[in-house]
Structures are given as structure tokens and as C-alpha cells.
Curated annotation (Swiss-Prot):
The active site is at C115, C211. Belongs to the MnmA/TRMU family. Residues 161-163, 326-327 are annotated as: Interaction with tRNA. This is tRNA-specific 2-thiouridylase MnmA. Keywords: ATP-binding, Cytoplasm, Disulfide bond, Nucleotide-binding, RNA-binding, Transferase, tRNA processing, tRNA-binding. Disulfide bonds join C115-C211. One of its GO terms (cellular component) is cytoplasm.
Length: 380
């Protein structure tokens, strides 16, 4: 399949064959094709497979070994050297402990965002530099561009796969040293390229969920590290209608897994989580996916991370932009104002199931400005 792609290092005066790029090889199709495209453009390409989870779990071990074998097969096919590295200690200290602390506080964190900031674009980048890399590359569906001397993060071309949401906490210095070879390609084309070149990963299923949980049930996994804290499920009026095993097992907007079924004297409509009351250990549920208590107009965040501080809005006056409060959500118009080192975002339209612990990520057009962890929500 012929594909025209602009050079990946347009601002680097060196020819491609003098530039070393180390690709983060996950054993999936996206990183495989990223390595292939770099190789085709003449870069000196190497791969690195990182192991970020060391807990003794048979299923996870088998998955990691399969991924490593697939990464090795692709590198052999492309005639590039594959390094391996174990970053499990750094992952535990900088990602997993935060994940547990957030769940203890009954919030719903996004460890993938922290993994990108702390591991893939920090530990991996530093390690690759020691191996002689001029740049690292990953299989993320996102792009970068230059503006006024700054490296900006842009959405990937494929709207169904854009991963800028997960990268908003990374800094511009890291992006300046990173290449995203498939950012201008749509996923079906990536698979077609891999199949045409005979890469073993061409039809491999995309990984989903949190990397260290794998295919296990989330509740079973969490119980391994955090003790259950049973409490009661109540409706919006405080009437008890069931029991829960722990607020940490539930998230705002959740429908499945509540275990309350039909409630005598109530309609058959499904129940949804509307609130988690930490002080009383009560899980508040409401009926109907459009119940008013599931919606909010405003959120506040923790410390705001602007990818390009020099280009960031001062917020000395209200700033208009779009936002996502979860991955794959269509962008929503909002107005930002300063709130300490965070922001207050007021949305034009009520937003459903905005969840403390998740991230609000802000955009201007296809430029990702940055984001922050959601602290509170409010209904006007």
C-alpha cells in the first residue's frame, strides 16, 4: 500500500539516516506500523519493549510474554534491534500507588494518563536517550506541530482513535523529542499496511482497559489491594434500597453491577449512580439515564497543566474553548476562569456523569491546550 507521509523530523537539519529513533514496541499493530514507517523513511530505528507490571499473576504474565514475542517478531521482520526494559518499580511508585490512593478516596482515577506522563514520556524517554536515541516514537494516534517556537499537541487524524486526551499531562519538551508516525493515518489503513507487509500484529485485537488489570474483573482486582467497605444504597430521598460492598467499586453514571434489580413500589427503569457520599458511606442512585441528578453545568479542577505555558491563556478574563471530561466524548463548549492554580469550567449545556478523579481536557480547534483532574462538580 503506497502512502505519502511527510518527513517526521522537518525541523531537524540532519538527514534521516543520521537520526536514531527508538520506538516503544507494545506488541500491537500501532507501534509495529510506526516502526515500519520510520524504517521506510530511512531513520536508524530501534525498538524497546517495556514491562511495567511485575505482580505475580499468571494471566498477566502470559499476556506480557505474548506481547514481547509479537514485538520481537515484528522487529526481526523489519531488521531492527529490540531492547527490553523493566520499569515496574517506577510504575508502582509513580502510577499504581496514586491509583490506589484515589480509589481509597472514592474517586475514579485514570492511570493511563499518569502512565503516559510518568513512564512512557519520562522514564522511557530518559532510558532511550541513554541508549543513544535522538527521538522516541510511539503508536499513539496524535500529532505535533510547531507554533512560535513551541511544540503543540494536536488531535490525531482519525477522530475515532484520537488519543490526545490521554497525553494532555505530558510537557512540550517531551513532545519535542517524540515522533507519532501514525498520527496522520486512520486505523483501518494502519491494519492494511501491517497486513501488506506481513507483520504478525496486523489482526491483533486492540488492548483495552487498564494495562495492569488485563482481562480480569475490576472489582476482583481492586479487592486484592483494598479491603471492602460495605454500606447502603439509597435513592435521592435517602431511602435505603440496597447494599454495596464499597464506594470505590462504583463510578458516577454507572448502571451495571449495582445488584438492586427491581425495587418494590418503584418503576422498572434502570438505576444509575448519581453520587458517592464518603462521610456516610452511602451510594446514591437514581432511575433513568436522563435523571437531573446525573447532570452538572460546572466543574472545578486541581492544578492545571498547560502543555505550552508560553502560549496558554492568562485567564485574566473568561476564556472560551471546548472540553472533554472523558475519552471519546464529543467536545463540549465551555468558559474557563481561574481558580487558584486550577480552573472553573462552566459548560454551555449540562454534562452527564462528570466524575471527580477523571480529567478535564481543553482544546482550541485541533490543538490540545492541556488539562487537569476534576475535583468537584456543581449543578446550577
Amino acid at each position: 500500500m503506497a502512502i505519502e507521509i511527510a518527513p517526521f523530523t522537518p525541523n531537524d537539519p540532519r538527514p534521516a539516516n543520521e537520526i536514531t529513533v527508538i520506538v516503544g514496541m507494545s506488541g500491537g499493530v500501532d507501534s509495529s506500523v510506526s516502526a515500519l514507517l520510520l524504517k521506510q523513511q530511512g531513520y536508524k530505528v530501534e525498538g524497546l519493549f517495556m514491562k511495567n507490571w511485575d505482580e505475580d499473576d499468571g494471566t498477566e504474565y502470559c499476556t506480557a510474554m505474548t506481547d514481547l514475542m509479537d514485538a520481537a517478531a515484528v522487529c526481526q521482520k523489519l531488521d531492527i534491534h529490540l531492547h527490553t526494559a523493566n520499569f515496574a518499580r517506577q510504575y508502582w511508585d509513580n502510577v499504581f500507588e496514586y491509583f490506589l490512593e484515589e480509589y481509597k478516596a472514592c474517586r475514579t482515577p485514570n492511570p493511563d494518563i499518569l502512565c503516559n506522563r510518568e513512564i512512557k514520556f519520562k522514564v522511557f524517554l530518559e532510558y532511550a536517550k541513554k541508549l543513544g536515541a535522538d527521538y522516541i516514537a510511539t503508536g499513539h494516534y496524535t500529532r505535533t506541530s510547531q507554533h512560535e517556537g513551541c511544540t503543540q499537541l494536536r488531535k490525531g487524524l482519525d477522530p475515532n482513535k484520537d488519543q490526545s486526551y490521554f497525553l494532555h499531562a505530558v510537557g512540550e519538551q517531551e513532545f519535542a523529542q517524540t515522533l507519532f508516525p501514525i498520527g496522520d493515518i486512520e486505523k483501518p489503513q494502519v491494519r492494511a499496511i501491517a497486513e501488506e507487509r506481513g507483520l504478525v500484529t496486523h489482526n491483533k485485537k486492540d488492548s483495552t482497559g487498564i494495562c495492569f488489570i488485563g482481562e480480569r474483573r475490576f472489582k476482583d482486582f481492586l479487592e486484592t489491594y483494598l479491603p471492602a467497605q460495605p454500606g447502603v444504597i439509597v435513592d435521592e430521598n435517602g431511602v435505603e434500597i440496597g447494599k454495596h460492598q464499597g464506594l470505590m467499586y462504583h463510578t458516577i453514571g454507572q448502571r451495571q453491577g449495582l445488584g438492586i434489580g427491581g425495587v418494590p413500589g418503584r418503576p422498572e427503569a434502570p438505576w444509575y449512580v448519581a453520587e458517592k457520599r464518603l462521610q456516610t458511606n452511602q451510594l446514591v442512585v437514581v432511575q433513568g439515564s436522563n435523571h437531573p441528578l446525573l447532570f452538572s453545568n460546572e466543574l472545578t479542577t486541581g492544578a492545571m497543566h498547560w502543555i505550552n505555558p508560553r502560549l496558554a491563556p492568562t485567564l485574566s478574563e473568561p476564556f472560551r474553548c471546548t472540553a472533554k471530561t472523558r475519552y471519546r466524548q464529543p467536545e463540549q463548549w465551555c468558559t474557563l476562569t481561574a481558580n487558584g492554580d486550577g480552573v472553573i469550567a462552566v459548560f454551555d449545556e449540562p454534562q452527564r456523569a462528570v466524575t471527580p478523579g477523571q480529567s478535564a481536557v481543553f482544546y482550541q480547534g485541533d490543538i490540545c491546550l492541556g488539562g487537569a483532574v476534576i475535583e468537584t462538580t456543581r449543578k446550577h
